[in-house]
Swiss-Prot record:
PANTHER family: TATA-BOX BINDING PROTEIN. SUPFAM superfamilies: TATA-box binding protein-like. The keyword NAD does not apply. Belongs to the TBP family. InterPro entries: TBP, TBP_archaea, TBP_CS, TBP_dom_sf. It comes from Methanococcus maripaludis (strain C6 / ATCC BAA-1332). Gene3D superfamilies: TATA-Binding Protein (3.30.310.10). NCBIfam families: PRK00394.1-2 (NF001593), PRK00394.1-3 (NF001594). Transmembrane segments: none annotated. Pfam families: TBP. Keywords: DNA-binding, Repeat, Transcription, Transcription regulation. This is TATA-box-binding protein. General factor that plays a role in the activation of archaeal genes transcribed by RNA polymerase. Binds specifically to the TATA box promoter element which lies close to the position of transcription initiation.
Length: 181
């Protein structure tokens, strides 16, 4: 049965221009904060789509919190439009690259994390963090497995890798169970 995998965060980056006047941009944009003594970038939070955008003087822009790449692109275009209308010289349609996606799913069972921690590429220190960290090399992602059966997959570039990772973990857990019991 195909697992229900839900994307919960997409982080993208792009270049919207060069030498951005962040003080001016902060004055123009609603919900923008610019405190250079705290953080070198301007932080702008949108409610629709619900994302946070980080804009740097270099023109680099990161968008986080989107549920899909399309939402991030919409948010970036909204910001570019607002800044251009205020006279800023920016790139109209910048190339947007996915840096990371985070997905969640369920195993459908409560795994024995102590047993799984015997596998290579796993870390489990319940005193420090309740989840088991499982680093896969293909696809190159990090899978967090919790005792409740909840799974978080991070480091994704494409959704297909979430399914590959889930299949690989499921297969490995079945093999481990057969070996141990």
């Amino acid at each position: 049965m195909e697992p229900e995998i839900k994307i919960v965060n997409v982080v993208v980056s792009t270049q919207i221009g060069t030498d951005i006047d962040l003080e001016y941009a902060a004055d123009i944009l609603d919900n923008a904060e610019y405190e250079p003594e705290q953080f070198p970038g301007l932080v702008c939070r949108l409610s629709e789509p619900k994302v946070a955008l980080l804009i740097f003087r270099s023109g680099k822009l990161n968008c986080t919190g989107a549920k899909c790449k399309e939402d991030a692109v919409i948010a970036i275009h909204k910001i570019i439009k607002e800044l251009k209308e205020a006279g800023m010289d920016l790139i109209d349609n910048p190339e947007v690259n996915v840096q990371n996606m985070v997905a969640t799913t369920e195993l459908g069972m409560e795994p024995n994390l102590d047993d799984i921690s015997t596998l290579e590429c796993t870390e489990y220190e319940p005193e420090q963090f309740p989840g088991l960290v499982y680093r896969l090399s293909d696809p190159k992602v990090v899978v967090l497995i919790f005792g409740s059966g909840k799974v978080v997959i991070t480091g994704l570039k494409v959704i297909e890798d979430a399914y590959k990772a889930y299949d690989k973990i499921s297969k490995t857990l079945k093999e481990l169970e057969e070996e141990l019991y």
